[in-house]
């Protein structure tokens, strides 16, 4: 498995991320079958505006760019939300990406492992995430890494 290092995202990287993330999230929502692409685009824009009112500087949100520790090449990114709950400091991964051409080469696992290390260093007691039902590769990775299902949404088409 490759090793990665996480570096706080720069403003330039954040702006590049945001230039594609709204549409990517909308596509994920629409492909899950929960709403039309038009409605998903509206939901995506509203969600990003609500979650990131101050962009990269939004309180309790952290963005990291992942680099291959050996080559220095950029391999992906992760966006994590921090929240204090009754059990202590928790984290939720809002977005996790591996560059498309590098998928299935161990970088997903490496980014998740590096993220867990950073979160432990910061005193985080648990981390959660969402995965769309049709993303079988990600679901498999998360299960292999010890994530447990905490809720499931299901639907059945009637027409």
PLM ranges: what are they?
Residues 112, 120-130, 153:
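Conserved GNAT acetyl-CoA-binding A-motif
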Residues 86, 102, 137:
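Active-site-proximal flexible loops/turns
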Residues 5-99, 118, 149-158:
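Acetyl-CoA-dependent GNAT
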Residues 95-98, 104-121, 140-144:
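Conserved acetyl-CoA-binding loop-helix of GNAT-fold acetyltransferases
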